[in-house]
Amino acid sequence: MFSNHLLSLAIWLPIAAGLLVLATGCDRRAPLARILAFVGALAGFLVTLPLFTQFDRLSGGFQFAEFYAWIPALNINYALGVDGISVLFVILNAFITLMVVLAGWEVIQKKVAQYMAAFLIMSGLINGAFAARDAMLFYIFFEGMLIPLYLIIGVWGGPRRVYASVKLFLYTLMGSLLMLVALVYLSFQTGGSFAIEDFQNIKQIPLFTQQILFAAFFLSFAVKVPMFPVHTWLPDAHVEAPTGGSMVLAAITLKLGAYGFLRFILPILPDASRYFAPAIIVLSLIAVIYIGMVALAQTDMKKLVAYSSISHMGFVTLGMFLFTNQVQLQPWALKGAIMQMISHGFVSAAMFFCIGVMYDRLHSRNIADYGGVVTVMPKFAAFMMLFAMANAGLPATSGFVGEFMVIMGAVNYNLCVGALAALTLILGAAYTLWMYKRVIFGAVTNPHVAEMKDINRREFAILAILAATVLGMGLWPEPFIAVVHQAANDLIAHVAQSKI
């Protein structure tokens, strides 16, 4: 019965759970709100698991499809489906939401119900964006998830939370308005349809028109990634966001922008993608190298990891726009970009949670305030070492898989581009291990550090689960690659066809 509606359950179950949690009201019922939020997040994650176990890895196209006429007068439909690209993001989102609920279990003491509800509702909206097969449905979910994210940062964030949340909202909203115009134009070209498949199957779009549409989509998605130079909102948002907000922001919401490239720009506008590919490659390399060096200069742990996220996402966009002979996408690079997004979801969430664990004890993100943490928190130090190594792209961790595949594609594309891309391994090791060394090792010079207690059972469980995912994907990436393989090959074949 439920197997035909798994995607609807993945969307509406977290939203319904969020509304139920919200109904618990005041903080006197905070224990009940936490339990309901955990049950809702766990149920939301469990309903996504059949999407992975029952997914046909040899079949292309959308699976678990659902279709209902929604607004017939405008030809807008409730159409859902996942392919090998989007299915992993739906599962990742549900998993990270469960981790976020556990992460805020004891830390959040005020407006607990509202906090938990915001994350659950946002999780459902994000799943809707990843599963939508109707462009207007995608747009509604894509924009709708900004509201709970805005509230999470604006209500539970740091001293400059209002500035950070408004900046995030304005950056993302301005780009999205242009995307709406592009969607309406494409609908006219299909005779009124908003189906994403119909957009992708438009036979002829002049190059100049493709370039205009590319600019409209690109601004919207590039801000979300975020790409250089429209990245400045992200460090502010991360610094001010609560730990759970940073976990979701880095692990999930950034992926929506990159997903937009895969779902809209590349298949709908292949000629414009080839035309602008050299510029995208340059911007991506700037993000990888320059932003990596900016991360080296940071003294705030959250800012350092925020800049490292921009650098890693630069690696993702690089892998998406490597065309062989200006015709065909590099298969290894494209699949590596998707693997990098999944890995970054695990690793970035873990890194921000580690910073949150230390902040809860010392109430400081300044690297200079720490030192010698391993002497008082040995279990925590061991976990953080694993995540630091994964962030640096160490083999046998998930961080290595996608980076290695993208570098393979980059070297095949151009040796110089491959060499520049490989610098991310050096820079990643430099800024991550520099932070780890100064925070974890050395003598205890701050008396407050000496009073810090090692991780409790809740924190240990979260870190152990995240560690298992990082090591599992690093040691056995084949199940992830197998899911992506056919959808990526279909996208490559589609993009190779000119629409001029």
Which residue ranges define each predicted feature?
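Alpha-helical transmembrane segments of multipass membrane proteins
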Residues: G18-A23, L49, L98-L102, G124-G128, ...
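Juxtamembrane/interfacial segments at transmembrane-helix boundaries in multi-pass membrane proteins
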Residues: F55-N77, S176-T232, D236, F261-A279, ...
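Central hydrophobic cores of alpha-helical transmembrane segments in multi-pass inner-membrane proteins
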Residues: S8-T24, F38-L51, L92-G104, M122-G124, ...
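C-terminal ends of transmembrane helices
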Residues: L19-D27, T97-Q109, L151-R160, V225-V239, ...
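Transmembrane helix-loop-helix hairpins at membrane boundaries of multipass inner-membrane proteins
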Residues: M1-L6, L20-A117, S193, E197-Q200, ...
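Alpha-helical multi-pass transmembrane bundles of energy-transducing inner-membrane proteins
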Residues: D27-L32, A117-I121, L125-T209, V294-S364
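Predominantly late transmembrane helices and immediately cytosolic-facing juxtamembrane segments
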Residues: F228, S348-F352, G418-E451
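Structural signature of hydrophobic alpha-helical transmembrane segments
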Residues: F2-L13, V82-N93, A135-P148, Q210-V223, ...
